[in-house]
């Protein structure tokens, strides 16, 4: 329970208490309607001063913010800075001030139970009330585990001085399920920020928060079903993992901590974790490139973010060989729709087979039903780089096309500011062009998309562009839709191609902030 001071609200004798089953509205100034408020919240203004971050708020801190120009209110465990909302509150500023610096949950429920406050005040969210968990009985002697929290003495303090606030977690249960809740203290957490693996009643859940990784790693105290669900409440930065019990017994505790449990460290310092994925299909795309489909285990939740890669691992002549590959969609045409919320259990890869190579021939020899080890996502591409971009240019050579697939998908389905996206695709011959037919169908389907091919060893019949990446080719290709339109460029291919391309882009006066080079 929250021990936060409560206030009488509405005040005795106030219009809101006198009115039967409701409240009297207070006349608002011009331009202070609910629609005006929603417009203001979409303006991008920072209403909390936390720049999108979330904090844990103590009772003492909450009490300090009790003035009209600095008013925090706690509703159902979450703290909001309602100062910007004062002039927009239909019940008037004075009534809102009754809960200033206090827990307004009961007051809110009495008058506003029907209101979707999470949506209306989401831009005012400061964070979550700090709650001191109760200590239940130990699961096993000598392993003291709190109700979803390890004692501070057992937690490695790996949080650097700079970086996001350390997350926390808790858990609760019903007769048939156990729910683990991770409080990330950051807004805009997505399903692809969460990776969950359940194996032999060992739970491993990783939340990627900016450039850090928070890990829950527990040997569960009881058996659970292999299927589970993951839910993300983006605007409050909350992750819920719901496990189904095998037996309807009451758990005294969640379980025992395993390696690196409750750790929060820079992502670059975490090791790769692999799970076994089954080969479901493989089909020819070109004379030397295949489309591989791998199925995740039913006890895994993993979605690869746009433009990021994973590592595939095989045992070759007694040695483990690891190679990075960027997942793609099954097809350029079928995937251009809103994604479903349920996790996708299949991962697709476009992989060129090198007959003299060590890894790809072994991969190509796998039979349907065989297994490949797949790591979690890696990479530094962030879709936030594409925010408000109007002209997107993609430069790809060979299988450097693969990261462009998800970038292209995201651009055409989620970027409302986009005027055009152009792909310049470098290959040796026409036979090497991956998904050429699909690219041309997509260009017909969506007029914002345009593709140009450049061949280094074309046939005599080829009428298109030829050669290698050059200043002349790029200066002609990189034409903005408007003189001052916001642009972004992605480039991927063999290292010499990428390095030369970035050098040429700099020569053409594009800045580092406008360029992303994909490297593994």
Curated annotation (Swiss-Prot):
Gene Ontology MF annotations: cytochrome-b5 reductase activity, acting on NAD(P)H; flavin adenine dinucleotide binding; heme binding; metal ion binding; NAD(P)H oxidase H2O2-forming activity; NADPH-hemoprotein reductase activity; oxidoreductase activity, acting on NAD(P)H, heme protein as acceptor
Entry's localization field: Endoplasmic reticulum
Protein residues bound to heme: 89, 112
Enzyme's top EC category: oxidoreductase
Domain of life: Eukaryota
Region (Disordered): 1-27
Major localization class: endoplasmic reticulum
Any single biological process term in GO: superoxide metabolic process
Catalytic activity: 2 Fe(III)-[cytochrome b5] + NADH = 2 Fe(II)-[cytochrome b5] + NAD(+) + H(+)
Domain CS as annotated: residue spans: 164-255
Modified residues (N-acetylmethionine): 1
SMART domains reported for this sequence: Cyt-b5
A Gene Ontology cellular-component term: perinuclear region of cytoplasm
Keyword entries, A-Z: Acetylation, Endoplasmic reticulum, FAD, Flavoprotein, Heme, Iron, Metal-binding, NAD, Oxidoreductase
Protein name: Cytochrome b5 reductase 4
Annotated gene: Cyb5r4
